[in-house]
């Protein structure tokens, strides 16, 4: 996503959220369960496992993983890859969120890149909000 900031700002907050991160019980249909069992057997050589092992892998081990990266005027200013479904990249002249660099001049062209590593479900909802003041 690219936005041209219309003036110089003192503070910038980039918020990204998505859901769900993990499968919910209502997401796992009999067809999906069979697909996952067949896939794990074929790709990873995993044979039959106990129902408890399968549930732990599906409901806790598998996850949607989406990170965010930002540049300002084609210069890297931050990257967030925390295991949270809502995260902020916050910038001022003297402070910034961990993984980000303080920005004394918040102006110009802001680019936010959504880095998708894994998405469990089609139509995963997400929201990107940019606030400047």
Q: What is each PLM-predicted segment?
A:
Residues 1-133:
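Acidic, Ser/Thr/Pro
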């Amino acid at each position: 996503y690219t936005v041209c900031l219309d003036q110089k700002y003192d503070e910038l907050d980039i918020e990204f959220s998505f859901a769900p991160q993990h499968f919910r019980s209502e997401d796992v249909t009999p067809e999906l369960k069979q697909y996952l069992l067949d896939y794990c057997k074929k790709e990873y050589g995993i044979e039959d496992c106990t129902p408890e092992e399968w549930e732990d892998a599906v409901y806790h081990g598998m996850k949607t993983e989406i990170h965010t990266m930002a540049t300002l005027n084609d210069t890297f200013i931050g990257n967030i890859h925390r295991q949270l479904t809502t995260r902020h990249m916050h910038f001022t002249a003297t402070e910034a969120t961990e993984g980000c660099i303080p920005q004394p001049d918040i102006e110009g062209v802001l680019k936010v890149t959504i880095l998708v590593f894994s998405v469990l479900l089609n139509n995963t909802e997400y929201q990107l909000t940019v606030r400047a003041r």
